[in-house]
Amino acid sequence: MGKKQKNKSEDSTKDDTDLGALAAEIEGAGAAKEQEPQKSKGKKKKEKKKQDFDENDILRELEELSLEAQGIRADRDAAAVKPTENNEEESASKQDKKKKGQKGKKTSFDENDSEELEDKDSKSKKTARPNSEAPLSGSEDADDSNKLSKKGKKAQKSTKKRDGSEEDEDNSKRSKERSRVNSSGESGGESDEFLQSRKGQKKNQKNKSVPTVDSGNEDDDSSFKIKTVAQKKAEKKEREKKKRDEEKAKLRKMKEKEELEKGKKEQSKQREPQKRPEEEVLTLRGTPDTGAASEEKGDTAAALEDDNEGDKKKKDKKKKKTEKDEKEKEKKKGPSKSTVKAIQEALAKLKEEEERQKREEEERIKRLEELEAKRKEEERLEQEKRERKKQKEKERKERLKKEGKLLTKSQREARARAEVTLRHLQAQGVEVPSKDSLPKKRPVYEDKKKKKTPQQLESKEVSETLEISAPVEAVDQGGPEKEETPPSVEPEEEEDTEDAGLDDWEAMASDEEREKEGNMIHIEVEENPEEEEEEEEEEEEEESEDEEEEGDSEGSDGDEEDCKLSDEKDSGKAGDTKPSKDASSDSEYDSDDDRTKEERAYDKAKRRIEKRRLEHGKNVNTEKLRAPIICVLGHVDTGKTKILDKLRHTHVQDGEAGGITQQIGATNVPLEAINEQTKMIKNFDRENVRIPGMLIIDTPGHESFSNLRNRGSSLCDIAILVVDIMHGLEPQTIESINILKSKKCPFIVALNKIDRLYDWKKSPDSDVAVTLKKQKKNTKDEFEERAKAIIVEFAQQGLNAALFYENKDPRTFVSLVPTSAHTGDGMGSLIYLLVELTQTMLSKRLAHCEELRAQVMEVKALPGMGTTIDVILINGRLKEGDTIIVPGVEGPIVTQIRGLLLPPPMKELRVKNQYEKHKEVEAAQGVKILGKDLEKTLAGLPLLVAYKDDEIPVLKDELIHELKQTLNAIKLEEKGVYVQASTLGSLEALLEFLKTSEVPYAGINIGPVHKKDVMKASVMLEHDPQYAVILAFDVRIERDAQEMADSLGVRIFSAEIIYHLFDAFTKYRQDYKKQKQEEFKHIAVFPCKMKILPQYIFNSRDPIVIGVTVEAGQVKQGTPMCVPSKNFVDIGIVTSIEINHKQVDVAKKGQEVCVKIEPIPGESPKMFGRHFEATDILVSKISRQSIDALKDWFRDEMQKSDWQLIVELKKVFEII
């Protein structure tokens, strides 16, 4: 039986594999047969099959159903092992079903026909089997199938591919079933036939629309369907349900896997200890699936045992199976509560671990920071310790130098020369005291230390140099014995001293010093109370010597203090500082000697200057006052210079170019002139006038000269603000008020031009208050009205103002003095008020002080004198031959005063006068200083005097600090004009104008224009010809310089009035610009974008005349146009633009204009409609050259939107 079954199974497998080939043959054979004979033959076959039907077939069918149930379970196991394969097969089978269903719908056959078709197909497949029961039916089936192949050709084609895959699947199932059936007994012998029939039935179930019967033996179809169809449907529903559940479970698993992968990625960044809880989570999540698999295996085993019990048991199994499936679904739905809890606990542990590690990391970083801070503190303390040690060593060396115990190389050479001289003297027979005749040293050495060597008791020479060098020799030789250090230290100490200067040594060479030095030997060597007494004696000797050396009281005071300070330090540290030190420390401080010497000299000079200033500040004499410095400020043409002319009885204003003040001037007004001018003031006490006179400074009022106004106001004690009564406060008046506010300078207001009041009657010989009372009513009313208006304007500026004769509180109210520079009214009252206010309110400020305070006002080049500086001497005195430090363009300038020139009394400093030469000048004066190297002096900064050479570096540093701000103002450009002026003040004003006009300047100079200036300016011809210009303000132009400028092509503009120079240069720039615009007008292309109006096409070709809308930019005549959308075709040049039949030169954005575009010469004319359409945008054809020309010469005609369009077109034309 077993062999027969095996043979049968082998045959069945062979038949299954040959089905595809057999179907193809059947299709080919039966292509030409008709449908009706097929139906009739099919009925005959069915009748034969019914006859052969027997009871054994029913039993086999039941067994097959039970095996099928087992096969489903096996399928489920296989699906658990390989879920992906089943998914693919199921999806493929579903697609096949859909395709089959669609094809079935298309065909015109009904269900009965399709059923017959399937039956015959299945029978044809059975023909190949060597089944003993139905050999005839197999051959008949083959014949029938040949007949039916034509009819079922399409259906077979659609199912062909699906059959192949299903056969593979069924083969695997049959092999499993065979193994089970062999063990089940006799009923298993006929399982092969049942399996073959079940294969057909499964295909029918998958094809819902075409149910087929595929039994091996001839069965009765009707009786067979009644038994199995309901069961098949139920099983099919269960299978579909299970498949859905399995798909859901797979989706859940996929999601869980993704979540786990994300978690793994996040946790892999952390340390290895953190990975263990994650593994636990993974194992916990893996448990439900394994349990489910084991249960399934148990189910299949149970099912095999119960298969043979029959139909009743089968139903019970189905119920059990459905309950188990539900349980499995519940398990597959997700992890249980315990699993979730375990996962949460694992995650909590993981989080705690992270927090713990974070805390540990923070603590570690904190510890490291504390250790670092501790280390830095130790380093700082160590550094301080080293610095203290170094400072002590410096002080010791400094003291030794002061005492003359350290010898430099030059000093040793001098010592050798002195020895040679001594031998010569002895050879000539001069008596020289022997070493025995000299007094012995103190016995202190013998008490404390070893006995002296003979070298320490060498004789002292007679000459001064020998007297000086002997004690130092004793120190150098005696030092090593006392310190008990190796002899190698001695040469190193000598090396330290090599860099010390000879001057310090020679400065101390005097008789008293020799005695002192003899005693000073013991300072460094001994450490006892006697040493301090000796030091005190030596300090007194040093003080007396310094006084003799300095020769003047100021220097001696400073040196006494220095000596006391330094020696007090020395005596205080004498016990602490010990001479013992190793060779390394010597070499360490060896290089510091030069620096410390310079620093020492610098600090000494600084202390001396500070002490001198402090003493001068204390010795202020309030009884003796200096002349107050009065500054005159105001708007243009208010009468500032005219007021001064009236005071001085001069005509400076008439001699000025254009009547404009362009320089700062200073006038000395002596006491006699004050008394003369104030004789009409009755209550003026002329006997008690304490000021020796007045120094009045006149400043320019024009806008350009704000720097000079600022400079003049910065050094004045009191100011006169001149206001035109007819015009009130004007721009420069308000600027002057703000300057005075910022400087906190007191001022009085001169209400000038009262003679302009209607019916004013002048009375210069009387007080202005009396003169006002004498005027007519209408004149007084007008004056009061205008005065009140000006008081209101002052109130708007935050100042209280009142007429001087009504002012009860001059500290809170500004005094207004009505004046007339033309008639002289009010001049006496003005001077009286100035004298009164300065004597009473400014007595402390005007107190006589020896401390020098001076300020450079102007730098001028005078013929026959060279470059001179006008200086306002505020305090102190200046002497001829003094070393002065003045600020310069390239740094402070150190020079000597060669001459002090003063203008005659009541004469203007800036006007060329017969200057008086003085040896000494006292404050306050306007003085002209002659000296060397004053060409690059900067005005507006202080002048300092150095009484000693070592003070020069200190004073230089003071000036450098103040220089920085002024130097930042004058910055030269690489390309620009050359500027030349008579004074620095007017040069600054000219540069300020150029800066506001955005004109660069490449060179500046003060003085006449020479050939060298033309040479410098001619350099610009190579860079930019428009800047090859010299602006000469109020200076003479040499003839040879003018000739050279003409030959080279350099323009020289010269004017005495700054505004005329401005106008001339501005006109030149405009002309030059027009010339260049004319030159570049064909190159410069203005950007534009035009849209064609299709209803206004007047001419389409040669020339093109069309109406357009300017969308952006501006269209000008001569603009070349192109069409970017048509491969940048050039259509021509705009030659004419019309608006409302009127021709215009330019059309701007938003305008609708008619343009005539003529073709480019030498090119074929372009045509509207062929080369471009109405939809195309026309743009101007720009290039890099045209853009540069616009930037350089047509910038004023371009707007911001035009530049934006250029940027847009650059991208279109790809211009870099």
Curated annotation (Swiss-Prot):
Chain segments carrying region G4: 752-755
KW Protein biosynthesis (keyword) present: yes
Family annotation (InterPro entries): EFTU-type (IPR029459), P-loop_NTPase (IPR027417), Small_GTP-bd (IPR005225), T_Tr_GTP-bd_dom (IPR000795), TIF_IF2 (IPR015760), TIF_IF2_dom3 (IPR023115), TIF_IF2_dom3_sf (IPR036925), Transl_B-barrel_sf (IPR009000)
Class of enzymatic activity (EC top level): hydrolase
Cofactor note: Binds 1 monovalent cation per monomer in the active site. Structural cofactor that stabilizes the GTP-bound 'on' state. May also act as a transition state stabilizer of the hydrolysis reaction.
Biased amino acid composition, Acidic residues: 110-119, 490-510, 526-562
Subcellular localization: Cytoplasm
Region of interest: G1: 634-641
Biased composition (Basic residues): 96-106, 148-160
Reactions catalysed: GTP + H2O = GDP + phosphate + H(+)
Region feature G2, mapped onto this chain: 659-663
PTM annotation (Phosphothreonine): residues: T107, T300, T497
Active site: H702
Protein function: Plays a role in translation initiation. Ribosome-dependent GTPase that promotes the joining of the 60S ribosomal subunit to the pre-initiation complex to form the 80S initiation complex with the initiator methionine-tRNA in the P-site base paired to the start codon. Together with eIF1A (EIF1AX), actively orients the initiator methionine-tRNA in a conformation that allows 60S ribosomal subunit joining to form the 80S initiation complex. Is released after formation of the 80S initiation complex.
NCBIfam families for this protein: PRK04004.1, small_GTP
Official protein name in the record: Eukaryotic translation initiation factor 5B
Gene it is expressed from: Eif5b
